[in-house]
Amino acid sequence: MEQSQGNIANSPPTSEIPQRPIILSPPPLDQNSLNQSFNNLPTSVPQGHANRQQSVGYNLQHEFETLTANLDLDLNSSTRNITQSAPPNQQQQQQSQLQATDSQLLTTTADLNTKPAHSVKPTLAAPAASRYGSHLGSDLLGKSTSSLLGDNNPVSPIQKFSSINTQLDSLLNNNISSAKSKTGTNSPFLSNAGLSNRPQSVNDFSNIFNRQDQQQQQQSQTFSSFTTQQQSQNQNQNQNQSNFYSDLIVFSNWIENLNPQDNLTMIDYLCSNLPLDILLTFKSKLDLHLQGGSAQNQQSQQSQLLPQFVMSPYSQYDQQLYNDMDKLNIQDDSFKSKHGNSSFRSNHLANLIDKVERPKSADPFVNNTKYGQYQQQSYNQHSYQQQHPLVDRAKSPTSHLYEKTNFLQLAAANSNNTGGNYNQYMPSLSSTSSSLGQANSNNTSTRDDMDLKLGALATINSRVALDSNRKHPHVATPGSTWNNQTHTHSHISPPHHNQMHSGVRNVSNFEESINRSLNSSSVPASMHKSNYSNSHGNNSNNNSGNTNINSNQNKGTHKKKINSPTSAVSMQQNSTSVNSTTSGNGGANANVNTTATTSSSSSSSMPIEVSSLELLNNIPAWLKLLRLHKYTECLKDVPWKELIELDNDQLESKGVAALGARRKLLKAFDVVKNNLPVV
């Protein structure tokens, strides 16, 4: 506190400090003016006042002055006091305006008298632009903006700039003269309608409303001139169209009068000089014209629908594509069949030439075996069905197994095993067997393997059928029932009735042989012939000798057939052989022989087909009959005459390791030796 009081005491009195004007802003950038302002001050100013730190206001003033320099603002006029922040008084402002208008009038009158009208370059620059020198239009504002400075405002000063680029000056002069000729006015300045509405300078706010009126007047003038120009263009277009067609006529007549050499020269010239789209259009038009009138009419319709794409080469491609699609027709000649018209088509019948061959799997015998079995005996079957209705196979729950097994056996058969008698009663399968035989003969290396595979499948089906036949005996063995019926009714039947029953027995025996082969151990289809031939050959003796067999023996054989379906045919053949002996020797021998053959056949379950010559010639099929096809590889190369002479040790050396298989083979060998086939 004492120091502060001492400082106040030592400070000079306020009366000694002279009064100076209050400065609201920091001193300007100009150092000379700053020195003058400090020189005017008395010497009693404290030291260090001139070198004081620049304040924030001083920095703002510096930025403001640089901004005014960039915006071309005249803030440094000579009439202003540098240290004075307030605007000048009214007298100074009026004097400066009078001096500016006098100088402007003098310069404009001098320029108009000395130079032509088109050489004057108007400008929109503010009066402050004069301080930047004579190169404002070319250097500072640039060449592109110097042409936009024209204005017919009488208040704005018209200054004369000496541009560096003389070519740009001549271009501006030409633009002024052309604008003058178009607008029809005598003013040497550019029209305001072609200029953008450019904002005025900062200090020039005078006569802005009059300028808008002038722009509206010039716009109305240009609109009226545009309407008149449009009318004249329409008239010229009509004249040009008439001239165009007349020129086309003259050009076509000129082409017609040219010689061939000149025509070639003209075409070469046009092809080398015309644009590509015109050449493509001409090519498409020429192709459509050469194709005919219908295509040309379609082309004209499409060109009327799409007039904007006429000259486009892509539209021509599209039109060609559409034309080709329109030509596509279902009844086109290129898609018709090449077969000639047949006489069957006129009668709406199936044409046998065009008919596709039916597949072999669609054979009626495969799905309906009754058709193939009875087509030769249809009359006898019909007469017998009226008295004794047959049991239909379709009632059996395993009816599909018969068809499957029969089909697999037919596929396993080769060409050597196709018999004529079998095809006689199965004509629907004769073509199938022959075609399969041809295929097997062409493929001899894999024939046996295919037979084994198909036979194995047939074995599975036959075993299932055997189990089903044990459950349904009345369905499985219809032949035995029919034989019993014929045996019981043979005593009272008249001769003509016996003849009818003989035909029915032929059918029943054949059906029995089919069932026997289907339910056995995969017997190939060739065995049907031997089965039927044996049964058919013995039927002649049945007519005379079946009356001597009593009903008790028939009942016994019927039970054995049910229990053992595999021995059904052998029992039947034994009975028929007994009948043949009873016709010559008497009834006593018949009873003895019947019991002997019955006991012998019942003791051995070996099928009688093992002695068939055709099976013996085909060892794989013979082994399949015995259900020993697993030893096919061991025994297939041994002839049957040597095979039946083998003993137990030789079979074991051949590869038959199972004792049961060797015993079964030895039994089969004995059967073959007892019933040697006739070679």
UniProtKB/Swiss-Prot annotation:
<dbReference type="GO" id="GO:0015031">
    <property type="term" value="P:protein transport"/>
</dbReference>
<dbReference type="GO" id="GO:0000932">
    <property type="term" value="C:P-body"/>
</dbReference>
<feature type="compositionally biased region" description="Polar residues">
    <location>
        <begin position="79"/>
        <end position="89"/>
    </location>
</feature>
<dbReference type="Pfam" id="PF07647">
    <property type="entry name" value="SAM_2"/>
</dbReference>
<feature type="compositionally biased region" description="Polar residues">
    <location>
        <begin position="563"/>
        <end position="573"/>
    </location>
</feature>
<keyword id="KW-0694">RNA-binding</keyword>
<protein>
    <recommendedName>
        <fullName>RNA-binding protein VTS1</fullName>
    </recommendedName>
</protein>
<feature type="compositionally biased region" description="Low complexity">
    <location>
        <begin position="530"/>
        <end position="554"/>
    </location>
</feature>
<keyword id="KW-0653">Protein transport</keyword>
<dbReference type="InterPro" id="IPR001660">
    <property type="entry name" value="SAM"/>
</dbReference>
<dbReference type="InterPro" id="IPR050897">
    <property type="entry name" value="SMAUG/VTS1_RNA-bind"/>
</dbReference>
<feature type="compositionally biased region" description="Low complexity">
    <location>
        <begin position="214"/>
        <end position="239"/>
    </location>
</feature>
<dbReference type="GO" id="GO:0005829">
    <property type="term" value="C:cytosol"/>
</dbReference>
<feature type="compositionally biased region" description="Low complexity">
    <location>
        <begin position="90"/>
        <end position="100"/>
    </location>
</feature>
<dbReference type="GO" id="GO:0044010">
    <property type="term" value="P:single-species biofilm formation"/>
</dbReference>
<feature type="compositionally biased region" description="Polar residues">
    <location>
        <begin position="30"/>
        <end position="50"/>
    </location>
</feature>
<feature type="region of interest" description="Disordered">
    <location>
        <begin position="79"/>
        <end position="100"/>
    </location>
</feature>
<comment type="subunit">
    <text>Monomer. Binds to RNA.</text>
</comment>
<feature type="region of interest" description="Disordered">
    <location>
        <begin position="1"/>
        <end position="50"/>
    </location>
</feature>
<keyword id="KW-0813">Transport</keyword>
<feature type="domain" description="SAM">
    <location>
        <begin position="614"/>
        <end position="675"/>
    </location>
</feature>
<comment type="similarity">
    <text>Belongs to the VTS1 family.</text>
</comment>
<comment type="function">
    <text>RNA-binding protein involved in post-transcriptional regulation through transcript degradation.</text>
</comment>
<feature type="region of interest" description="Disordered">
    <location>
        <begin position="516"/>
        <end position="604"/>
    </location>
</feature>
<feature type="compositionally biased region" description="Polar residues">
    <location>
        <begin position="179"/>
        <end position="213"/>
    </location>
</feature>
<dbReference type="GO" id="GO:0000289">
    <property type="term" value="P:nuclear-transcribed mRNA poly(A) tail shortening"/>
</dbReference>
<dbReference type="InterPro" id="IPR013761">
    <property type="entry name" value="SAM/pointed_sf"/>
</dbReference>
<feature type="region of interest" description="Disordered">
    <location>
        <begin position="179"/>
        <end position="239"/>
    </location>
</feature>
<feature type="compositionally biased region" description="Polar residues">
    <location>
        <begin position="1"/>
        <end position="17"/>
    </location>
</feature>
<keyword id="KW-0547">Nucleotide-binding</keyword>
<feature type="compositionally biased region" description="Low complexity">
    <location>
        <begin position="574"/>
        <end position="604"/>
    </location>
</feature>
<feature type="region of interest" description="Disordered">
    <location>
        <begin position="469"/>
        <end position="502"/>
    </location>
</feature>
<keyword id="KW-0963">Cytoplasm</keyword>
<dbReference type="GO" id="GO:0000166">
    <property type="term" value="F:nucleotide binding"/>
</dbReference>
<dbReference type="InterPro" id="IPR037635">
    <property type="entry name" value="VTS1_SAM"/>
</dbReference>
<dbReference type="GO" id="GO:0003729">
    <property type="term" value="F:mRNA binding"/>
</dbReference>
